[in-house]
Amino acid sequence: MTPGIRPLVAGNWKMNGKGESLTELRAIAAGLSSDLGRKLDAVICVPATLLSRAAETLEGETVGLGGQDAHFKTSGAHTGDISPEMLKEAGATHVILGHSERRTDHHESNKLICAKTEAAWAAGLVAIVCVGETASERKAERALDVIGDQLSGSLPDGVTAENTIIAYEPIWAIGTGLTPTVQDVRAAHAFMREQLIERFGAKGAHLRLLYGGSVKPSNAAELLGVADVDGALVGGASLKAADFLAICETYRNL
């Protein structure tokens, strides 16, 4: 944790969830309506098909709602894409950009993610920008170089703690059950903080840095207690309210 920064736990449902999944969303909102919700912020990023119904479910609750990607243009001939303005109208407050699965499956570049981030801001959304290295890059001892390049290329100059959140997700740890050591996470987050302060000054010191990659109730305390880890980007464990809330509960004792 970073002193003075309110933690955030974000759930990424990926390509999972249909109407019945809103039961889990209601349970998450209910669990965070207690004193637990005063200890952290929470956001659930659902598939686009659920956004409007999820917004209705979360009306009056403290849980934020996010999309999982957005185009960099407001409208046009872009079949299958969704603009930030559309996400906002559907009830989103946040949007994940540059997730490793988008970078890999759709060959998204740092330049494209930078453009998407600016578009998200223009629509009034908070951008959750993801960075992280592959297994081969880590093996070649290039992890920090890759993270640095992604931070430099994916973040516009207008970054503030209000419009941007950074998520470090070592690609080799996503959905594999593998988790970096505490030392690895500490080194990556310390490096990111250093790079952000160097570029953005005091603003960089206040940006929230999330860790993402096989976060679950059994390892949450260890990971979320690391210096400069200001929360988590949770994948599979966010699909079940009990697991997501158990991760959030970690902040009662940190």
UniProtKB/Swiss-Prot annotation:
Pathway: Carbohydrate biosynthesis; gluconeogenesis; Carbohydrate degradation; glycolysis; D-glyceraldehyde 3-phosphate from glycerone phosphate: step 1/1. The active site is at residues 99, 169. It is found in: Cytoplasm. Keywords: Cytoplasm, Gluconeogenesis, Glycolysis, Isomerase. Its main location: cytoplasm. Substrate binds at residues 12-14, 175, 214, 235-236. It comes from the Bacteria. It holds the Pfam family TIM. Its EC number is 5.3.1.1. Gene3D superfamilies: Aldolase class I (3.20.20.70). One of its GO terms (molecular function) is triose-phosphate isomerase activity. Transmembrane segments: none annotated. It catalyses: D-glyceraldehyde 3-phosphate = dihydroxyacetone phosphate. GO terms for cellular component: cytosol. Belongs to the triosephosphate isomerase family. Involved in the gluconeogenesis. Catalyzes stereospecifically the conversion of dihydroxyacetone phosphate (DHAP) to D-glyceraldehyde-3-phosphate (G3P). NCBIfam families: tim. Homodimer. This is Triosephosphate isomerase. It comes from Brucella melitensis biotype 1 (strain ATCC 23456 / CCUG 17765 / NCTC 10094 / 16M). The lineage of its organism: Bacteria, Pseudomonadati, Pseudomonadota, Alphaproteobacteria, Hyphomicrobiales.
